[in-house]
């Protein structure tokens, strides 16, 4: 049966895309808006606050697309109202705000999660399967790179570049995807982090460059480099997992644009007979945010909130990612390595 979804906020870079995804998703018969949606909200039913969602037909789920300073406030009200809720990453400015949402969810039994959409990416699914199959053996080394278009190209006056509204910079907003995927693909929690950050543009007060070295509880060590640093192209984005028997590289963006491909080199059959193997793992197309992946993400969350199946991530994953980010910031401030709890 088609459900009813509420989109909350509107002042988020992904809000318009998610609105299109929700509108075209076959699992929803109606979209209700709450917040500031401007010209995009003209054709939809609207409510002035969360209480208004309870005055009409029941809402099956909500998706919060708001500023980081506002998102946890919206989410808290939704969970207390008994509405299963997705919150755009990184959910909040601090891990304490995420922990509060987890506590409310535990006490009310209302499910919530964040939009770690890349967990559904075909390249990510394949990498995780390959590691599970022993293709690279015991994991020893990880690298992640999230280098993207410069702050100048992204509008320095945007709320994303002010600590009061965003909470942090490149590590907080974009590299949090990389932070999450390392843990997800490796099936291993972080143990330590050491980092340096830099803010080189005077008009912003969050980091535009971050470099973090980390340890995983399984013994591997790794590195994440993130930067708003490209004056022309969009991205230089990749991940590498190395083990005792091989390595796998995911080249997500390069000079030619998006090229979702895996490069596998392994001493394990059936890979050992070739020097290396390239596999194309493109993201499925489609409109809205994330194309078909975005649609599938909403469908899976709706089914999970109804108890039909488990979801691909939860509030604990959001908490782990933000604790890593905060640990990196603390390390950059103190010059010391920070221990991370699981």
Label the model's feature ranges.
Residues 1-43:
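N-terminal Rossmann-like dinucleotide-binding module
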Residues 25, 240-316:
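C-terminal glycine/acidic-rich active-site capping loop/insertion
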Residues 100-118, 138-142:
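Rossmann-fold dehydrogenase core element
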Residues 173, 180-256, 295-307:
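Contiguous beta-strand/loop segments that form the cofactor/metal-binding neighborhood of enzyme cores
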């Amino acid at each position: 049966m088609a459900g009813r979804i509420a989109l909350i906020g509107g002042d988020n870079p992904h809000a318009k895309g998610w609105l299109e995804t929700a509108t075209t998703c076959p699992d929803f018969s109606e979209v209700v808006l709450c917040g500031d949606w401007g010209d995009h909200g003209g054709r939809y039913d609207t409510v002035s606050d969360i209480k208004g969602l309870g005055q009409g037909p029941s809402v099956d789920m909500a998706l919060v697309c708001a500023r980081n300073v506002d998102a946890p406030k919206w989410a808290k009200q939704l969970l207390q109202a008994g509405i299963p809720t997705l919150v755009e990453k990184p959910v909040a400015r601090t891990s304490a705000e995420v922990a509060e949402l987890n506590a409310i969810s535990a006490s009310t039994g209302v499910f919530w999660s964040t939009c770690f959409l890349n967990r559904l990416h075909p390249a990510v699914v394949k990498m995780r399967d390959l590691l599970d199959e022993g293709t690279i053996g015991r994991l020893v080394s990880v690298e992640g790179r999230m280098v993207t278009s410069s702050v100048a190209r992204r509008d320095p006056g945007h709320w994303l570049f002010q600590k009061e509204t965003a909470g942090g910079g490149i590590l907080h907003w974009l590299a949090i995807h990389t932070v999450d995927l390392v843990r997800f693909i490796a099936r291993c929690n972080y143990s330590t982090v050491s980092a340096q950050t830099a803010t080189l543009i005077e008009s912003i007060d969050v980091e535009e460059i971050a470099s973090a070295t980390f340890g995983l509880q399984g013994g591997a060590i790794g590195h994440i480099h993130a930067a708003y640093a490209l004056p022309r192209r969009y991205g230089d984005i990749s991940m590498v997992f190395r083990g005792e028997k091989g390595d796998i590289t995911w080249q997500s963006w390069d000079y030619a644009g998006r090229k979702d491909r895996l490069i596998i080199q392994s001493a394990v059959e059936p890979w050992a007979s070739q020097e290396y193997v390239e596999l194309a793992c493109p993201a499925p197309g489609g409109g809205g945010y994330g194309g078909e992946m975005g649609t599938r993400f909403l469908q899976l969350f709706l089914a999970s909130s109804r108890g039909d199946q488990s979801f691909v991530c939860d509030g604990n994953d959001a908490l782990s990612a933000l604790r890593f980010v905060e640990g990196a910031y603390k390390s950059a401030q103190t010059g010391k390595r920070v221990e991370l709890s699981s």
